[in-house]
Swiss-Prot record:
Keyword Secreted: no
Record lineage: Bacteria, Pseudomonadati, Pseudomonadota, Gammaproteobacteria, Enterobacterales
Protein name: Sel1-repeat-containing protein YjcO
Signal peptide start and end residues: 1-17
Record-linked Pfam families: Sel1 (PF08238)
Sel1-like repeat windows: 48-66, 85-101, 143-173, 180-215
Length: 229
């Protein structure tokens, strides 16, 4: 699961008695001090919703100089509702981005458009995302394009542009799953994000409907639920 998606779906646990623990394939190497294994293990725990274990392994990897792990630490600090720390997250994300982490660029951009981190800087955020979105071999390109689409769909800090939003969502979906980006945008407008996205039922319906039209079943389900609710 992408990092930006986890902001909406954090703390969702999947209890499967017969399944291995998240990232178990990385555990041996992580315990032996392999910083990339530590990062991948942290990322696995983050995606599964265990922020405590994610932070433990991300910190180990970051201490060894892994820039992506530093970006993940920043993401954790803007995800955990118990200990939100946007200023510290910004410091970590800047460090990660300066070290060349595309994940760091996306996370920093997300922080820069949220008022909880101070005065928003949309031009810098958009520049970071445009840069990250060009590396299609990197998973962060999916998140970068989704966030660009959301910024244009939201129309705060910059002029709203649904055509640009649609273009970025489709580009993101083309390298992930068709209709998912529009679904994600719809759910963001449905639930809101403090400091960035205000709840907006009409925008939620618009993007969920487009997701459904793209063939994303969950988008259809949420659109129907919201329409009839």
């Amino acid at each position: 699961m992408k990092k930006i998606i986890a902001l909406m779906l954090f703390l969702t646990f999947f209890a499967h008695a017969n399944d291995s623990e998240p990232g178990s394939q990385y555990l041996k190497a992580a315990e032996a001090g392999d910083r990339r294994a530590q990062y991948f293990l942290a990322d696995s725990w983050f995606s599964s919703g265990d922020l405590s274990k994610a932070e433990y392994w991300a910190q180990k990897a970051a201490d060894s100089g892994d820039a992506d792990a530093c970006a993940l630490l920043a993401q954790i600090k803007i995800t955990n509702p118990v200990s939100l720390d946007y200023p510290q997250a910004k410091v970590l994300a800047e460090k990660a981005a300066q070290a060349g982490s595309k994940e760091g660029e996306v996370t920093l951009a997300h922080i820069l458009v949220n008022t909880q981190a101070g005065k928003p800087d949309y031009p810098k955020a958009i520049s970071l995302l445009e840069n990250a979105s060009e590396d299609l071999e990197n998973d962060s390109a999916v998140d970068a394009q989704m966030l660009l689409g959301l910024i244009y769909a939201n129309g705060v800090g910059i002029k709203a542009d649904d055509d640009k939003a649609t273009w970025y969502f489709k580009r993101s979906s083309a390298i992930s799953r068709t209709g998912y980006s529009e679904y994600w945008a719809g759910m963001m407008f449905l639930n809101g994000e403090e400091g960035f996205i205000e709840k907006n039922k009409q925008k939620a319906l618009h993007w969920l409907n487009l997701s459904c039209m793209e063939g994303f079943d969950t988008g259809c389900e949420e659109f129907e639920k919201l329409t009839n609710g």
